[in-house]
Amino acid sequence: SAFDLTVIPTFAIGCAEFFHPADEGWGPRPVPKVCGCPELAWHIAQSVIEDEFDLTIMNDMVVDHGLTVPLSLLFGQPQAWPCRVIPLAVNVVVYPSPSGRRCYQLGKAIRRAVESYDRDLNVQVWGTGGMSHQFQGPRDGLINSDFDSAFFDALLNDPEKLAEKPRIDYLREA
């Protein structure tokens, strides 16, 4: 993970010029550094903080598999990624994690921030941290495709209802 257990922010936004791949125990992944967009990241941070969200500002941040693997799946193995990225880390590692409602509201606040920005840029905001896998215990490697399909349908068709789903349901079902 990009964070160790000494500091785990609930929400953190990367505001740096670039982000190096994290060493997750086997050395950093052999992928390009991720180029950021500090001017837009700072605009988003200021906007969502004014919108009552407390973000941890990361001026130096490494990015883990939660960002570098999806980038690799989308773009292969280029010498440099074809887009700039603003990483947004969400604590899903230790209790207490934010509720679905809180994450949904933050997503809406980020959208307002991006829409209010006065420049036309090619930048992606990536939220990392999620329910896609558990590395230990009896559910290690389990994929619940029925839950996943229902989740993605609800994400598109009824995000308000999905935002009310209790955290424990994700732990049991995802």
Annotated model-derived regions:
Residues 1, 88, 121-129:
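Beta-strand elements within well-structured catalytic alpha/beta cores of enzymes
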Residues 133-135:
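Short, solvent-exposed loop/turn segments at secondary-structure junctions
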Residues 5-105, 116-119, 137-174:
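Flexible, D/E/H-enriched segments
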Residues 110-115:
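A short, acidic, amphipathic alpha-helical segment used as a generic capping/interface helix at domain edges
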